[in-house]
Amino acid sequence: MESSDVELDFQRSVQAVLRELNTPNPALQSNQGMWRWSLHKKVERNPGKSSILVRILLRELEKAESEDGRRVIIPLLLTLMSVLTKATGIPEDLYHRAYTFCTRLLTLPAPYSTVALDCAIRLKTETAVPGTLYQRTVIAEQNLISELYPYQERVFLFVDPELVSASVCSALLLEIQAAQEQQTPEACMRHVVSHALQAALGEACHTGALNRKLQASSRRVLEYYFHAVVAAIEQVASEDSPSRLGHLEKMEEIYCSLLGPATTRRHCVGDLLQDRLPSIPLPSPYITFHLWTDQEQLWKELVLFLRPRSQLRLSADLDALDLQGFRLDRDLARVSTDSGIERDLPLGSDELPDPSSSEMERAALQRKGGIKKRVWPPDFFMPGSWDGPPGLHRRTGRPSGDGELLPGVSRVHTARVLVLGDDRMLGRLAQAYYRLRKRETKKFCLTPRLSLQLYYIPVLAPQVTGQDPEASRKPELGELASFLGRVDPWYESTVNTLCPAILKLAEMPPYLDTSRTVDPFILDVITYYVRMGTQPIYFQLYKVKIFTSLSHDPTEDIFLTELKVKIQDSKSPKEGSSPRRRGAAEGTGAELSMCYQKALLSHRPREVTVSLRATGLVLKAIPAGDTEVSGFFHCTSPNAASATDCSCLHVSVTEVVKSSNLAGRSFTTSTNTFRTSSIQVQSQDQRLLTLWLDKDGRRTFRDVVRFEVSPCPEPCSRTQKSKTSALNSHGQETEKNMAKPNSLLMPINTFSGIIQ
């Protein structure tokens, strides 16, 4: 195909992606997302034409910038970065052009400036040292051993077998296994060596002879050249002013050593013309498939992810921790019971210095510390400290927050937890996330070495043919997915459209032959999402205290999307009560007393207490429309706003209204709505309540007389509590400031975050 034909084909595909992004057509929802995938496949089949697609994408980006078409900037920019990560032979002027464009976006508000900064950092490294992005991505995602680049990533795919059908689970598992059986460590190392040499040498690289040599090499030889290539790239990339010429000389030495001088001398123009540039695939990440059947399964899998790398040097403090985390927690403080005078310690004590040391020559009286506490960074308990400083996001192949929370301990592991399902699955994820954060306050095990990233792909039950869509989808189980699609158009086009393809895959007969190359659409979309979805949206978790008796302690639980309340069937009236005094309305609903803090735009506290008769109420934490998205409901950074700024419940109460007319009394129902950050509800008569959390029938609480809902606070450690009590002795003002904990926010990664 001629270059003009290829350019025209690429141009049509890019325009189709933009049309789908700007004017989504619900009638073609089953085919949405295919244009982006087919565009990437065209480049993979003809990698020598990658520079043509790069020019087209840059032209469309500059056009969108001039016409203020911000809706398409982030999708085009992420598509460009995906192409540049895989491609070789891109002219240097295109890298500089892309880098300059990203620097201009830094003047725009978030999320454009945030995504542009992330892309600019990667482009600067790739321009100086071609092949860096590809190499780091493969090493991290495939868990290849490298001392110079020790970062490791893993994708944990969690599916609840009670919410997702067995056919969907088996179809996904077979597709993942079929792709990963072709991604052996030897194949990945061959890809890294071949890509690095082609990216550095360009047309001077004899690709045919290189690939034949790599295929014939033993594992020992392959590992030798793999480590040589990694060392050459990482050493140059770590320099303050990388020299592209020096990098080229090192890669030429490796190339000549691998092929030998005789082969390199025979490399002539005729060989170059006959040697078509081969496609070097970028392997999909290492994915593990899990059926979520245990409440502690997420914690256990994360701990097992860290254990194989136990040879990494850790601080003495972390070495003392129990990595499994299943034994009793050790105390964070050691309280001395002696007099505090070193001379009074008994002989043989472990705290006595060696007699030959110089410490014995010091004064006989020395104070010993009465309390020895472990000191953590002041903000590591906050959600932002799990992912590094706010505003700094992950680079490809390197997990976010890759600095050191503790001296000598680097966060070289990234766990990408991907859940499939509906809102009920997200409620289960919220429970696991809360338990994990609470456990970390007692045993600081995962946080210093692990960057946790959460992803969500909606998988909803198919609609019944011939049934009303509204009737077949009650209760609505995809509210959070709809919200993510409204605030992030690229998430809507890429991820929300994946559900029909997954259901279609489950209906197809299984293909058990894994020997031939597969071209999996679903796995490719998952790979694109976990690589490019770096911008989190933080959701407020809510704690609910449930009382079945006012004289007993409440049961506590959390929810993410919804709490639904129904009135249970009425019990028999108490003896002595007069049936004559029971009106018609006595059998409808229950008398409820509600006390809530009304949410106002001014954020001024206003407490409201009201009593009414109602048949039920619903508390929703997800905004229903675009007008509510642009308000103060959600925030894209855990430190961007206070809890009152980014937490708001939408309460709908079905109230029983009594009216009188000439025909007599009549009772109707009306729905009242209001917004609040916390609420307390108590039944005033003999009617009991039933609560459903996150639309999950397994999380049902019956015979409830009272419940209280408020933003879930960040779990607090004993160290923080002792610090708070110490500060309280200095004054009441300090106590007031320290008593209010921060709210616990759960991040879900998207492509752009919230676009206002």
UniProtKB/Swiss-Prot annotation:
GO biological process: angiogenesis; G protein-coupled receptor signaling pathway; positive regulation of angiogenesis; positive regulation of MAP kinase activity; positive regulation of T cell differentiation; regulation of natural killer cell mediated cytotoxicity
GO molecular function: 1-phosphatidylinositol-3-kinase regulator activity
Keyword Repeat: no
Major subcellular location class: cytoplasm
Membrane disposition: Peripheral membrane protein
Residue segments, region Disordered: 570-589, 716-738
GO CC terms, sorted: cytoplasm; membrane; phosphatidylinositol 3-kinase complex, class IB; plasma membrane
Tissue specificity statement from the Swiss-Prot or TrEMBL entry: Highly expressed in heart. In a lower extent, also expressed in brain, spleen, lung, liver, kidney, prostate, thyroid, salivary gland, dendritic cells, macrophages and neutrophils.
Primary role: Regulatory subunit of the PI3K gamma complex. Acts as an adapter to drive activation of PIK3CG by beta-gamma G protein dimers. The PIK3CG:PIK3R6 heterodimer is much less sensitive to beta-gamma G proteins than PIK3CG:PIK3R5 and its membrane recruitment and beta-gamma G protein dimer-dependent activation requires HRAS bound to PIK3CG. Recruits of the PI3K gamma complex to a PDE3B:RAPGEF3 signaling complex involved in angiogenesis; signaling seems to involve RRAS.
Protein name (record): Phosphoinositide 3-kinase regulatory subunit 6
The species this protein was found in: Mus musculus (Mouse)
